[in-house]
Regions:
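C-terminal capping/lid region of NAD(P)-dependent oxidoreductase domains
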Residues: 1-2, 212, 288-292, 304-322
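Glycine-rich beta-strand-centered segment in the early N-terminal region that forms part
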Residues: 24-41, 53-91, 102-108, 125-127
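N-terminal Rossmann-like NAD(P) cofactor-binding module of classical short-chain dehydrogenase/reductase
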Residues: 79, 218-219, 241
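NAD(P)H dinucleotide-binding glycine-rich loop of Rossmann-like/cofactor-binding domains
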Residues: 82-163
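Mid-domain Rossmann-like dinucleotide-binding core that forms the NAD(H)/NADP(H) cofactor-binding site
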Residues: 132-209
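Glycine-rich phosphate-binding loop and adjacent beta-alpha segment
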Residues: 179, 225-292, 322
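N-terminal Rossmann-fold cofactor-binding loop
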Residues: 186-190, 221, 244, 270
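A short acidic, Gly/Pro-enriched loop at the edge of an enzyme's catalytic core
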Residues: 210-218
């Protein structure tokens, strides 16, 4: 079958290890199902795998990809949930210390077929296109859990999204706007801030700019570069939900005094559960949300999508079709 896979790894030249070609068809073990992939989406996780982060070298060659939508063995249209719990685990799979994502231990979704545990598929709502459905299982699920599981916000509350352009940030803007939140964004690039406003944000500010009001919650994926601003922007009792640190994880100042004096909460968040993915798909379909897609390419041209993401030339999701 056709697949995009990591054949080698290089921290300096990640694209050198990407191959697009034939791989053996997967065989589903007992309790797993085979999904024939219709669409799959690209994530920065795939580039990190090519750099050698999170993917052990002894697992190569590894088919990349966490996001996919397709048809399961019974003919149902489904989305694939990428978080694989360890055998015997019950409860929230994101808390399983032995969990993995597709393409870390088990072969990923950038292929004609992928095998996953039977519980790791959720129905695709009829109102979602194949391309839209493929956008949801990673970045959008991460955003959904941040906003609706951890942030503790309600319609009318103000949420600050640090960094307007990333995949999670874009999803936060679209989800927050649809949920009746007042969404503010920051960006170093005025054009990207304007693009976020066009997607539904209520206002955009320069990175680090003093805000007109304190906010109820901050959605943090940037890390060190925005940490102090995030802490200082919160009202007393507010929450920072952090799911990434793209600028580094060691801020110059931890702001501990402000955190305890203002009784702030700092909450870590990673991916989401299968049930959250199912709720997300229903929410997106019911509200008529259209995930922002930068480009749609056949999987045979996967290298073009990887190269665009590596160069920072994407604005929205890159989706591959099969």
């Amino acid at each position: 079958m056709l697949a995009a896979y990591a054949a080698r790894q290089s921290a300096d030249d990640p694209l050198s290890g990407l191959e697009v070609g034939e791989r053996p068809d997967p065989v589903a073990p007992e309790g797993w199902t085979t999904v024939t992939v219709r669409t799959a989406a690209l994530n920065h996780h795939d580039l990190w795998s090519l750099r050698g982060v999170g993917l052990p070298a002894d697992k190569l060659p590894m088919i990349l990809g966490c996001d996919a939508a397709g048809v399961d063995e019974s003919g149902r249209e489904v989305l694939v949930h990428a978080v694989i719990a360890s055998p015997g685990w019950s409860g929230d799979e994101t808390l399983d210390p032995r969990r993995s994502l597709l393409s870390e231990v088990h072969q990923g979704t950038l292929a004609e077929k992928v095998v996953v545990p039977t519980r790791n598929v959720v129905p695709k709502p009829a109102g979602l296109s194949w391309e839209q459905a493929a956008c949801l299982p990673t970045a959008w699920l991460t955003a959904y859990r941040m906003l609706f599981t951890h942030a503790g916000v309600h319609p009318g509350d103000t949420v600050l999204v640090q960094g307007a352009a990333g995949g999670v940030a874009t999803a936060l803007v679209q989800l927050g706007s649809a949920a009746g939140l007042r969404v503010w964004v920051t960006s170093r690039d005025a054009a990207k801030g304007e693009a976020a406003v066009a997607l539904g944000a209520d206002a955009a500010f320069a990175s680090g700019e003093r805000l007109p009001d304190r906010v109820d919650a901050v959605m943090e994926t940037v890390g060190a570069a925005t940490w102090s601003h995030s802490v200082k922007s919160l009202r007393p009792g507010g929450r920072i939900v952090i799911s990434g640190a793209t600028s580094g994880d060691a801020p110059a100042k931890a702001e501990l005094t402000t955190i305890f004096f203002k009784q702030l909460q700092v909450i870590g968040s990673t991916m989401g559960t299968r049930d959250e993915l199912e709720r997300l798909t229903r929410f997106v379909a019911a509200r008529g949300i259209e995930p922002k897609i930068d480009r749609v390419l056949p999987l045979a041209r996967a290298r073009e999508g990887f190269a665009a993401m590596h160069a920072g030339q994407v604005d929205g999701k890159v989706v591959f079709t099969l």
